[in-house]
Amino acid sequence: MGKGTPSMGKHGRSKTHIRCRRCGRHAFNVAKGYCAACGFGRSKRIRRYSWQNKKVNRIRIR
């Protein structure tokens, strides 16, 4: 089998993300070794940005 379209069908077999040990969300990338939600495995600090929360009346709420 080559590297083109036939091999793309093999991508859906293994799990990309598993449950994270720190945040509990289903966002820990097995291949890269870090969580996409909280940043576990990449940094000690929890990944959190202000744009993750909705703004109401020009004031950012949690």
Swiss-Prot record:
MF (Gene Ontology): rRNA binding; structural constituent of ribosome; zinc ion binding
Cofactor binding remark: Binds 1 zinc ion per subunit.
Annotated Gene3D superfamilies: 2.20.25.30
InterPro entries: Ribosomal_eL37, Ribosomal_eL37/eL43, Ribosomal_eL37_CS, Ribosomal_zn-bd
Zinc fingers classed as C4-type: ranges: 20-38
Pfam families hit by this protein: Ribosomal_L37e (PF01907)
Keywords associated with the record: Metal-binding, Ribonucleoprotein, Ribosomal protein, RNA-binding, rRNA-binding, Zinc, Zinc-finger
Superkingdom of source: Archaea
Keyword Zinc-finger: yes
Cofactor names: Zn(2+)
Residues annotated as binding Zn(2+): C20, C23, C35, C38
SUPFAM superfamilies: Zn-binding ribosomal proteins
GO annotation terms (biological process): translation
Keyword Zinc-finger: yes
NCBIfam families with a match to the protein in the record: PRK04179.1
Annotated function: Binds to the 23S rRNA.
HAMAP family: Ribosomal_eL37 (MF_00547)
Family of the protein in this entry: Belongs to the eukaryotic ribosomal protein eL37 family.
Name of this chain's protein: Large ribosomal subunit protein eL37
Organism: Staphylothermus marinus (strain ATCC 43588 / DSM 3639 / JCM 9404 / F1)
